[in-house]
Amino acid sequence: AQPDYAPQEYGLGAVLKPDPYNVTVRKATEHRIARTFGTERKIAEYLQSLNLPDSSVITDTVYGFGILAASPRPRVFVIPSDPDFTELLNDPSANGIRYLLAVPPIGRGTSDALNLRYPTLYNTGADVATLELEVPNDGDGQPDWRLYRVNERVVTR
């Protein structure tokens, strides 16, 4: 893996092959990249503290894989590989989804399923959710996160 094309995978070298006496530029780069997931770990910890039921948070794994990997309860998340992902994303309030975890619709974020379904989600909540938490990312080349609480469905009579 090359740091310009697959930075997360490149950084795994620091985790999978630790070598504290290696002071090469490559090892330093691996360590810098591996540290980039501190923000994602904090988001996972925050969501864990909410004691959410399974399938409560929708996110895409384009960037969200670090959060899932850090979560002690990955079943809290609905991700694109889940068979009901599209159904839940299309109507989150009717399907018990409580949060949408969004990244900016720029760079790799343009391919994020939430941004494709709700192009204004990151900026406005797309009329389906309300901004609850904004998390600036201190990681190398990683996006800032926004956690949106899904709006309750309005019942008309």
Predicted regions and their residues:
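Solvent-exposed loop/turn segments at secondary-structure junctions
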Residues: 63-65, 82-84, 105-109
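Membrane-proximal, lumen/periplasm-facing interface regions of secretory-pathway glyco-
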Residues: 1-46, 64-65
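Short amphipathic alpha-helical segments and helix-helix/interface helices
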Residues: 44-48, 88-90, 118-122
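Short periplasmic/luminal acceptor-recognition loop of GT-C membrane glycosyltransferases, typified by
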Residues: 31-75, 99
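Extracellular/periplasmic catalytic domains that process cell-envelope and extracellular macromolecules
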Residues: 51, 69, 91-95, 141
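Alpha-helical scaffolding within the catalytic cores
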Residues: 81-92
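Aromatic/acidic, Gly/Pro-rich catalytic loop(s) in extracytoplasmic/lumenal soluble domains
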Residues: 95-157
